[in-house]
Swiss-Prot record:
Catalytic activity as recorded in UniProt: ATP + protein L-histidine = ADP + protein N-phospho-L-histidine
Record keywords: ATP-binding, Chromophore, Flavoprotein, FMN, Kinase, Nucleotide-binding, Phosphoprotein, Photoreceptor protein, Receptor, Sensory transduction, Transferase, Virulence
Superkingdom assignment: Bacteria
PTM field: FMN binds covalently to cysteine after exposure to blue light and this bond is spontaneously broken in the dark.
PAS domain mapped to chain residues: 8-82
Name of this protein: Blue-light-activated histidine kinase 2
SUPFAM superfamilies hit by this protein: ATPase domain of HSP90 chaperone/DNA topoisomerase II/histidine kinase (SSF55874), PYP-like sensor domain (PAS domain) (SSF55785)
GO molecular function, one term: protein histidine kinase activity
Enzyme class, broadest EC rank: transferase
Organism of derivation: Erythrobacter litoralis (strain HTCC2594)
Domain (Histidine kinase): residue spans on this chain: 139-334
PANTHER family to which the protein is assigned, alphabetical: PROTEIN TWIN LOV 1
Residue(s) carrying S-4a-FMN cysteine: C55
């Protein structure tokens, strides 16, 4: 059985820089129903050879039974779990697999699926490597775990709204794309390889705007970006990027539904009082008077509210002379503290 994702959604999952799997725990032996390309590259197993099988084929002689039982217990209890387990690739080579798993409920609110995200921690079995492994685990937890947890959370929300993980994931692929761009920006900034975990926000938001404008596909609708220079922690950038993705997409979907051309302005400005203001302004039809977005609405509205709350930000919607203006005020004082903490750790 294969998970029912549209082809462009499979491409979005496939481009992720980490291994992702989905298992259906309602079926006998809890088989995998989807794996992405990063999983194939990490393990050496092809998708066709593993879909329909329980993931125990990754286990071997030196796999800790205790780790296996902890994972099994989490599945039985429908709980999130994080574990580092010794697994084996298709060619028999062993490696440490840092695994994060989270449950998904079906439309009847029954625990049916488990999403697994895996990070290859290397091959060494030596006890002398414990300190180095601990350091790498800390890096994974700090840089990656929060973003992977956000993906699991978004899949959970999307599946509950769409009637199960086999439904269409048109919006989800865009949300994953925003995180994929973050990882690319980390590489450009050196944050994925060095100790610095800070990235320039403006460049990241510019890439998100370009990607969303491209996905929209209407050449006569322009997205202009103007961004002050500001560095933020990677975790913060991820949240802001997802938030901007939601607001931009909302503008493109609704502001120009009755016309073929228009302009959306994306600005990020450092304000007095140690605040960052992110503005999305369009010259479209304007938000209806009876619409209380994002306090009411669809899945995107719910995600916007959660991201705003997580950033400790304030969001205000203004109906302009033409179009709509969305201002998001994010406290920079907290972000500066996080940056200072990161550099102190380094």
């Amino acid at each position: 059985m294969a998970v029912g994702l549209a082809e462009h959604d499979k491409e979005a999952w496939g481009r992720l820089p980490f291994s992702l799997t989905i298992a259906d725990i309602s079926q006998d032996d809890e088989p995998l129903i989807y794996v992405n390309r990063a999983f194939e590259q990490m393990t050496g197993y092809s998708r066709s050879s593993v879909v329909g099988r329980n993931c125990r084929f990754l286990q071997g002689e030196k796999t800790d039974p205790g780790a296996v039982e902890r994972l099994a217990k989490a599945i039985r209890n429908c709980e999130e779990v994080e574990e580092t387990i010794y697994n084996y690739r298709a060619d028999g080579e062993g490696f440490w697999n840092h695994l994060l798993m989270g449950p998904l409920e079906d439309q009847d609110e029954k625990c049916r699926y488990f999403v697994g995200i895996q990070v290859d921690m290397g091959q060494s079995e030596s006890p002398d490597r414990a300190t180095e492994l601990d350091r790498q685990l800390a890096e994974v937890q700090h840089r990656v775990k929060n973003h992977l947890a956000m993906i699991v959370s978004m899949i959970r929300i999307q599946s509950s709204q769409a009637g199960g993980v086999g439904s269409q994931f048109d919006s989800l692929s865009r949300r994953v794309e925003a995180l994929q761009l973050l990882y690319q920006e980390m590489d450009i900034a050196g944050a994925a390889k060095a100790t610095d975990k800070i990235i320039p926000l403006g460049a990241y938001l510019g890439r998100i705007a370009s990607a969303i404008n491209h996905i929209d596909g209407r050449g006569a609708i322009k997205v202009n970006v103007q961004a002050d220079t500001v560095d933020v922690p990677v975790e913060t950038a991820g949240r802001i990027g997802l938030l901007v993705s939601e607001v931009l997409t909302n503008a493109l979907q609704h502001a120009f539904s009755d016309r073929a051309s228009g302009v959306v302005q994306l600005r990020s400005s450092v304000m007095s009082g140690e605040q960052l203001r992110v503005t999305v302004e369009d010259d479209g039809r304007g938000i209806p008077e009876d619409c209380d977005w994002p306090n009411e609405g669809n899945l995107g509205s719910r995600i916007v509210r959660q991201l705003v709350q997580g950033l400790g930000a304030e969001l205000n919607v203004t109906r302009g002379g033409t179009g709509t203006i969305v201002n998001i005020d994010i406290p920079l004082s907290q972000q500066k503290t996080l940056i200072a903490d990161e550099r102190t750790k380094d």
